[in-house]
Design a protein with these regions (language model features):
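Preference for protein termini
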Residues: 1-184
Length: 184
């Protein structure tokens, strides 16, 4: 198996956000205390209730072509991710930078096309992509913002280490899942 850190074959490494190997991380301390007071059967019941509610009100995503139920529940954990103020500031800077870069890419693709002409990206990957909209060529939206909401999927692999799994400018459904998760 490929490890994230070494790039070599071996055991897949993961990062435990709540524990530092010995103790509960400071950012998770109050959440841990609250959850620790809740009996395991209550936590399991609440998880099952949340999943049933998700299914009943249709908070699912479609996976076509794999057989079985195409409407699957989103992966949901009752335990929220906790970020320190410093972590959140760093993530915010990086996410804003990605949003600017993605909008600059779209501005170029639908405008001057320099990235394709320079050979940085093959033309077929852009112009033959099903998401490419010919009607947008030459259009400049207000403030040059083509995508107002961008879904950026993050994974944490270390204490100060985050990686982007994907950017979604078309239908960032994860935003709606996140908002609904807060309600449930």
């Amino acid at each position: 198996m490929l490890t994230l850190r070494s790039g070599r074959m071996g055991v897949l490494m993961y990062y435990n956000e709540m524990y530092d190997g010995t103790n509960v991380r400071e950012a998770y301390a109050s959440l841990f205390e609250w959850v620790a007071q809740m009996p395991a059967e209550i936590r399991q019941m609440k998880q099952a209730e949340a999943e049933a509610l998700f299914r009943r009100i249709g908070i699912t995503f479609a996976v076509y072509g794999e057989g079985g139920d195409p409407d699957r529940l989103i992966p949901f954990d009752m335990m929220p991710r906790v970020f320190t103020q410093g972590e959140w500031r760093r993530l915010e800077r990086g996410i804003k930078q990605r949003a600017r870069a993605l909008n600059a890419f779209l501005r170029d693709v639908y405008g001057r096309g320099e990235i394709v002409r320079a050979g940085r990206i093959p033309a077929r990957l852009v112009y033959q992509n099903e998401a490419y909209e010919k009607a947008v060529v030459g259009f400049v939206p207000p403030r040059g913002v083509y995508s107002h909401i961008i879904g950026i999927d993050l994974v944490r692999t270390g204490r100060d280490e985050f990686f982007v799994l994907e950017d979604n400018c078309r239908t960032p459904s994860g935003v709606s899942y996140m908002l609904e998760n807060r309600e449930i």
